[in-house]
Amino acid sequence: MAKFRLSLVQFLVSPVKSDNLNKACKLIKEAAQKGAQIVALPECFNSPYGTKYFPEYAEKIPGESTELLSQVAKECGIYLIGGSIPEEDSGKFYNTCAVFGPDGTLLVKHRKIHLFDIDVPGKIRFQESETLSPGDSFSVFDTPYCKVGVGICYDMRFAELAQIYANKGCQLLVYPGAFNMTTGPAHWELLQRARALDNQVYVATASPARDEKASYVAWGHSTVVSPWGEVIAKAGFEETVISADIDLQYLAEIREQIPIRRQRRDNLYTVEEKKN
């Protein structure tokens, strides 16, 4: 299939987990009814984002939130990239994205590899590592349309991860993310366009909607970028669902016109996966 429809769900996350789950399911179904074949949710879609919230809202996988995602993926017959949730496993906490197939099967469980530890004086300090542990594996899944690579938010800053995914054959990279009011306007779109251009892939980001009253204010602006580096769909900061047609023939044409994959000097440099 040369084209398929991707939808990104952007909504306000509340402190009430059941409300978040109900809203997510409602918007997923709306996207599917409008033709979406792959749907992605935001980072931390079932809980407020913050180190104090992660242990309180954490679940095992499978658990309440992921069981519901499995059901709605099966009901809608879609591939569902389940944003992320705080996950608890053996006394450790992770920021984890669960991906489900059209039959409700868990395809991939991506634990955020690069933890969001930053300190911008006078603007923002955040240390995910105060409560979270990093993941240590790559997350790729197959669809009838193309191969998809998954990262979470801060993972997008690391060009090596995107290149490894592209080398594995991914044509679409999806990053549920929640950039803030400092890094969002400066880097959110720039990073997506860079990753798309570097690797000649489609890049999509799904953010929570902006809640000015939250302790952590998300930038919003869920986005889809083409392998030409062009923004082809972009949300504002409010609740919405955006969609884009992912055109794999267009991707193939770009790779043929500017054949950087054949022109890399592997005799001089390489980015490769370490075997655990």
Curated annotation (Swiss-Prot):
Its main location: cytoplasm. GO terms for cellular component: mitochondrion. GO terms for biological process: asparagine metabolic process; glutamine metabolic process; oxaloacetate metabolic process. Its EC number is 3.5.1.3. Gene3D superfamilies: Carbon-nitrogen hydrolase. It comes from the Eukaryota. InterPro entries: C-N_Hydrolase, C-N_Hydrolase_sf, Nit1/2_C-N_Hydrolase. Keywords: Cytoplasm, Hydrolase. Residues 4-248 form the CN hydrolase domain. GO terms for molecular function: 2-oxoglutaramate amidase activity; omega-amidase activity. It catalyses: 2-oxoglutaramate + H2O = 2-oxoglutarate + NH4(+); 2-oxosuccinamate + H2O = oxaloacetate + NH4(+). The keyword Membrane does not apply. Signal peptide: none annotated. It is found in: Cytoplasm. This is Omega-amidase NIT2-B. It comes from Xenopus laevis.
